[in-house]
Design a protein with these regions (language model features):
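EAL-family c-di-GMP phosphodiesterase catalytic domain
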Residues: 35-42, 61-76, 88-194
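Conserved functional hotspot residues or short segments at active or partner-binding sites
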Residues: 81
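Catalytic core of bacterial c-di-GMP phosphodiesterases, primarily the EAL and HD-GYP domains
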Residues: 5-77, 153
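Single conserved hydrophobic/aromatic residue that forms the stacking wall/gate
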Residues: 1-2
Length: 194
């Protein structure tokens, strides 16, 4: 695989969001997945702070996603990185939540704003009572600890109805759309009045 340079990706996302804002679209947070190495990069905070200054970009419109595994493997280093990014105003999300053995107490001590529920919890949830109870428990824990919860990988009406019936309001997946190029995204939000 060919990895894109993460600093370039961050800058491109910032400039694309600013372009949409200049075209009259409401600017929404843009989320970028970071690998373990990228998240723990000691230069990341300075680069991001520099981009915020260069483009006069609101920090709350940038979100970084990383997996909970990073925190279970390198808790102190990951917590320091999370605190640094959080101090800039960046939102942090734990992606694929439920794939590792992260301690909920440790998660509440991090500067994490959002958990993204792994697709495995969503798949076949309409017919699996065990999954429904696990998801309901995670949802209630997130509410208790004031964490935003996103169900990722929602593809069908049945999955959507069961997830939203539990109370989860933020959904990601092919239920809405497959990934889109910026020009197609503009058409999509225009057609759907988003």
């Amino acid at each position: 695989t060919c990895a894109l340079p993460i600093y370039w990706v961050i800058e491109k996302c910032i400039t694309q969001n600013l372009e949409w804002g200049a075209c009259g679209y409401e600017m929404k947070p843009i989320s970028i997945n970071l690998t373990r190495r990228q998240f723990l990069d000691p230069n990341l905070m300075n680069v991001v702070a520099g981009l915020f200054t260069k483009y006069n970009y609101p920090p709350e419109l940038l979100e970084f996603e990383t997996t909970e595994k990073i925190f279970s493997e390198n808790f102190l280093q990951a917590r320091t990185a999370a605190e640094s990014l959080h101090s800039l105003g960046v939102t942090l999300t734990l992606d694929d939540f439920g794939t590792s053995f992260a301690n909920m107490i440790e998660i509440t001590s991090l500067c994490v704003n959002t958990l993204k529920l792994k697709r495995a919890f969503v798949q076949d949830i309409d017919s699996n009572l065990g999954k429904q109870e696990v998801v309901r428990t995670i949802y209630n824990l997130c509410r208790r600890f004031d964490l935003h919860l996103i169900a990722e990988g929602v593809e069908t009406n049945r999955e959507f109805n069961k997830i939203t019936g539990i109370g989860i309001k933020s959904i990601q997946g092919f239920y809405y759309s497959r990934p889109l190029l910026p020009v197609d995204f503009e058409k999509f939000i225009g057609e759907n009045h988003l």
